[in-house]
Amino acid sequence: MSSESFTISKKALITLIAASIVVIISLGIRQTFGLFYFDFNTDLDISISHFGFVMGLQLLLWGVFSPLFGVITDKYGGAVAIFIGFVFYLVGVLLFYSGYNTGGYFTLTIGVMIGIGLGSTAIGIPVSVVAKHFPASNRTIATGIVTCAGSFGYFVSPLLVRYSLVETGWENTLLYFSLLLGLGLVVALFVSTPKIPVGVNQDNNQTARDALKEA
C-alpha cells in the first residue's frame, strides 16, 4: 500500500468534491428525461419518434463536443470548459421552460443545447481534471470517486424527479432543474486544473492537442 497521502493538497480535495457534484447534477438530470415523455406528449404533442430523435441527437452532440471541450480545458482550464457547458445546459432548460418547447424548439433546447452542455459537464472533463491532481498511485481511486458520484446521480435522480412530476408537474420540475444547474455554474468554478499534472515532469506535460498531433 502506498504511503502517500490520498489528498495531496487542499485544492485537489476541493476539485474532487466539485467535480463529483458536477457529474451528479449533469448526469442526474440527463438520466430523467425519459420520465417526461408522457407529459410532453399530452401537453406539447411531442411524438415518440420526435422524442427519440431528440434524445439521439443529444447523445450525438455530447460525443461530438466532448473533445472540443477537451481542447478548451487544455488551454483555459476545466473550470472554464465546465462553466460553458453548464451555460448551454441551463439556457436549454430555461428556454424550454419559458415556452420554446414544441417542434423545432424542442429539438434546439433539449437536443442541441443540452447535448452541447453534456459535452463538458457529464463525465469526461471532470474526471480528466481530477486525474491531474493525483499521482498514479491514487489516481484510479480519485477518478473512481467521480465516476461513482455520476452513478449516484443516475440512481437517485429518477426517484426524486418522479415524485416531483407527480406532486408539482413537469414545469416546476424543470424550474428545479434550472436551480440545480445554476448551482452547477458556481461549483464549476472550483474545478481547478493544475498547471503541471501531479507526477508529470514539466518537460513531459503533453496536452490533448499535442497528443492528437503526435497520433
Q: Where are the model-predicted features located?
A:
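Extracytoplasmic
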Residues: 14-48, 66-69
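Helix-to-loop junctions at the C-terminal end of transmembrane segments
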Residues: 65-77
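C-terminal ends and interior cores of transmembrane alpha-helices
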Residues: 87-101
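Hydrophobic core of transmembrane alpha-helices in multi-pass small-molecule transporters
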Residues: 104-121
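Helix-loop-helix hairpin linking two adjacent transmembrane segments in secondary transporters
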Residues: 146-196
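Flexible cytoplasmic inter-helical loops of multi-pass small-molecule transporters
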Residues: 193-210
